[in-house]
């Protein structure tokens, strides 16, 4: 974790995007000492593959690394307590006609197997002396051809000062897209903008006035005065539906196998690559008796947790994982005594096997030193052409035991 904190400090020396108050109040501004030692980190919005990623995503990632989940969610919408993925989408097109703004996003990267918890529309605006309402129409577009109307809201984005980034809660609009796909009814969202440094997000409320979607005109005058596609971002906080991953299939395996950035050639060159199978055991603990334990292998250390540094560059994943570049996953090694005791937190099955081993040594093999408690890891990486912040479960060994 010390490495993570050191590497990620650069983001706060060069932040240019605002964050909602629930994040801002919990992210300390650090000095530039780390950046000076690592000049390559100063250009924080570009990866070594020359692909951009938003500063906001880096800020969010670092906040999750430095703060626990309870502190992160306190005072904010309870929906943020439940997300496991954050996806950022830059606008594909920004158009205007009088007091109407038309914003188009490619929602193809959004998984229909995910449940939307929170959606933020973040718009960067210049500091100007102006105050008038604007109707914002939000569309889904794919390859510049398909235009699906998602909804509209009315706001006065110039009415407040502070951060140039104005944030609007558009969860209600996009929930229809997540639930109904193409069958979306027109909704009208009215919102009163508040400064990002105030409540963190504009309040919003729907009016019962559904109707036909506004006429989409690709020849509208581009918003050269106010907006650019790089200054309009949709941030989606989602969670995979329980039924999708009910088997417990490791989420990172699926992600890595589908990534176009994984260097499989490097992996194939590594010597001694073999496939291993491991047993799945019950996780019910049993209070041990007073039978004295003995060592199976004289002189071999007992079951314990040891370091295992995973460097993503070394395993060919460096081109798609933004952060962390490496982390300590830990591993378990050592011998398990016969019979097992409470110190090694065995399952019922493992304890019975150790007792059989004590009395009938040739009948069963020795219990194995394995992880019994795991913790997740937050990772920022490219998924397709988008940047995703995702929490992958069972990435770090917290405790070892015998099974």
UniProtKB/Swiss-Prot annotation:
Gene Ontology biological-process entries: axial mesoderm formation; axis elongation; determination of left/right symmetry; heart development; involution involved in gastrulation with mouth forming second
Main subcellular location of this protein, as a coarse class: secreted
InterPro entries found in the cross-reference section: Cystine-knot_cytokine, TGF-b_C, TGF-b_propeptide, TGF-beta-rel, TGFb_CS
Pfam name, any one: TGF_beta
Gene Ontology MF annotations: cytokine activity; growth factor activity
Disulfide linkage: 303-369, 332-400, 336-402
Region called Disordered, residue ranges: 195-220
A cellular-component GO term for this protein: extracellular space
Protein family (similarity comment): Belongs to the TGF-beta family.
Protein name: Nodal homolog
Organism this protein belongs to: Xenopus tropicalis (Western clawed frog)
Lineage: Eukaryota, Metazoa, Chordata, Craniata, Vertebrata
Gene field: nodal
